[in-house]
Each structure stands twice: as structure tokens, then as C-alpha cells.
């Protein structure tokens, strides 16, 4: 079937989004053109500005349009003395929504993966080491994903922290709230049992 070259280009562009296949891209394109052209223009403008103006924070490496992000420049967070190490900026949003952390962050933009040729410098560990050396830190919280690569990355950073006398901790992981034990995989259940705590009455 022959379609407009611009329409084809739009559908192909939409497919760069995660989880968007040919049918989803087609539906999105037709919806924007048929029902919401003003929304499509807003989307185009927002994408253009974001792609050209959003960079990385000089301190924590998260996304920001400033040299240093609002979290890193917050005096209260600077005094906290804690840094939470995460794999992606999306992890910061997830942690911030809990309201349980009031320190600063460091974003790896990935994890160690020797098989893929991703080493310490590729995920900014040289910059993290500079912070360990120059800042007065009370704790580094390792919040990498509970995968083989995430665990290896956390262990590597933990050893790095020990070299500078900075306390390192790993976030707990285990059975999800509302989950049923019979549906939980063996590795997760093992972590839950190993990380159990006493009930205090």
C-alpha cells in the first residue's frame, strides 16, 4: 500500500519509542493527524526543545537543562552526606516518589558488563571516585538493579567506597508487598530470607 512519504516517516520515527511496533506507530500517527494536530505540534516542540536543551548534571549526571541539577544545588541535601547510586535517571524519579531519601544521587547510565565491553570509566566511576575523595560523605547507598550486572556493579562500588573509608549499603530487595510466595522466583525468595529482620514488640 502506498502512503504519504511524510506519514511513513512519522510512523517510522514513532517506532523509536520502547514497545511501539508498526501497528502502534500507525495508530499514534493517525490519531495525531485526525484528532489532535495541536497536541502533535506541542509534542514536536517539546521533543525539539528537550533533545537540544537537556544535558547532564555536572555532579550527579542526571538529566537537566542546567549545569547542576536542583537536587545537587539544594543545601539541605548537600548537608545530608548521603549519595544514592542508581543506574538511570528514571530510578531517581522512582526513589523521589517514596519521599524516603533526602540526599543526593549519582547516575551510572548503565552497569558494568565486561562481555559488552562496558568498564568502570564507561559508567562514570572515575567521577564517582572523585566525589568520594573530595566530599565529606557519611554513606553511599547502592540502588543498582537486582540483576547479575547490577550486583557486580554494586560490589565494585562498595570496594571503591571502602578504599576511601566511606560506608556503603545495598538497598534491600525481596518479596513485593501484596505478592504471594508461591509466585516469587527462587532468587528473590533467597534474598528475602537472607535479609529477614526480627520483630520487635
Swiss-Prot record:
Molecular-function annotations in GO: DNA binding; zinc ion binding
GO biological process: DNA recombination; DNA repair
NCBIfam families: recR (TIGR00615)
Domain of life: Bacteria
Function: May play a role in DNA repair. It seems to be involved in an RecBC-independent recombinational process of DNA repair. It may act with RecF and RecO.
Keywords: DNA damage, DNA recombination, DNA repair, Metal-binding, Zinc, Zinc-finger
Boundaries of every Toprim domain copy: 81-176
The family this protein is said to belong to: Belongs to the RecR family.
Protein name in UniProt: Recombination protein RecR
Organism of provenance: Enterobacter sp. (strain 638)
Gene3D superfamilies according to UniProt: 3.40.1360.10, 6.10.250.240, RecR Domain 1
Zinc finger (C4-type): 57-72
Amino acid at each position: 500500500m502506498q502512503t504519504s512519504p511524510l506519514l511513513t516517516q512519522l510512523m517510522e520515527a514513532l517506532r523509536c519509542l520502547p514497545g511501539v511496533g508498526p501497528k502502534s506507530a500507525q495508530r499514534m500517527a493517525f490519531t495525531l493527524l485526525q484528532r489532535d494536530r495541536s497536541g502533535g505540534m506541542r509534542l514536536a516542540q517539546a521533543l525539539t526543545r528537550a533533545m537540544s536543551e537537556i544535558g547532564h548534571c555536572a555532579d550527579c549526571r542526571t538529566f537537566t537543562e542546567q549545569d547542576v541539577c536542583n537536587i545537587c544545588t539544594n543545601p539541605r541535601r548537600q548537608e545530608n552526606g548521603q549519595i544514592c547510586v542508581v543506574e538511570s535517571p528514571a530510578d531517581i524519579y522512582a526513589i523521589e516518589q517514596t519521599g524516603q531519601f533526602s540526599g543526593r544521587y549519582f547516575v551510572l547510565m548503565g552497569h558494568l558488563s565486561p562481555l559488552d565491553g562496558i568498564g568502570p570509566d564507561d559508567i562514570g566511576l572515575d567521577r564517582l571516585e572523585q566525589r568520594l575523595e573530595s566530599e565529606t560523605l557519611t554513606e553511599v547507598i547502592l540502588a543498582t538493579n537486582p540483576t547479575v550486572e547490577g550486583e557486580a556493579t554494586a560490589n565494585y562500588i562498595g570496594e571503591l567506597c571502602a578504599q576511601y573509608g566511606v560506608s556503603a549499603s545495598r538497598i534491600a530487595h525481596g518479596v513485593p508487598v501484596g505478592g504471594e510466595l508461591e509466585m516469587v522466583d527462587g532468587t528473590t525468595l533467597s534474598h528475602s530470607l537472607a535479609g529477614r529482620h526480627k520483630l520487635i514488640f
